[in-house]
Amino acid sequence: MKINGEETDILRSYRSMDAEGRLAIMLGNYAVFPKIIRRAEKKIQYKIKTEQEYLRSHSRDELGVRVQTSGTSDPTFNEASTNIMIEDALKSGVIDKGILRGIKDAAVYEEDIRTVSNMRMDFELLEEIIEDLSEEDSKILKQYLVDGRLFKEIADDEGRTYEAIKKRMERIRAQIREEILECLEMNCRGGK
């Protein structure tokens, strides 16, 4: 199952899928899935920082509001701190409420952050499972998933029949499915 489109569509689709659907999305987009995750992270980070800047600029413009500070402000430190908090949230799925304080649609950002964190965790597990396959199985699967080669092409290179490669791929997928589904199901519990 290929997912083409914007990250919001991918995030929404991934979040709403069951374990089987999530596995299908990861396998169908295996070669580009890390890029999908990185792009989604960058967009979320950009949107949150833009919202924060909007809130800061509007709070300064309000008349009648006097904010007294110590006079020491370090915008570079503040931005670095915000970046670290957002990056940590995207990796762990745990959101410091301070980074979303006052932001409109904070709940949407929370869901997106948790989804991206789950996507990363799920994909890292899938990569580990694929790496742990026998060398030959891993090679054949990567030719299909990463290089986009057809079963016929793989069969020709391996000196085997199309049917033999097809059956082997079915066996490999079943092995991956068996290993990963329990974990994906646990991750789906809080993902909807």
Regions found by a protein language model. Name each.
Residues E131, L145-V146:
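Short, locally clustered residues in the helix-turn-helix/winged-helix DNA-binding domain
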Residues M1-I129, E182-G191:
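N-terminal interaction/assembly modules
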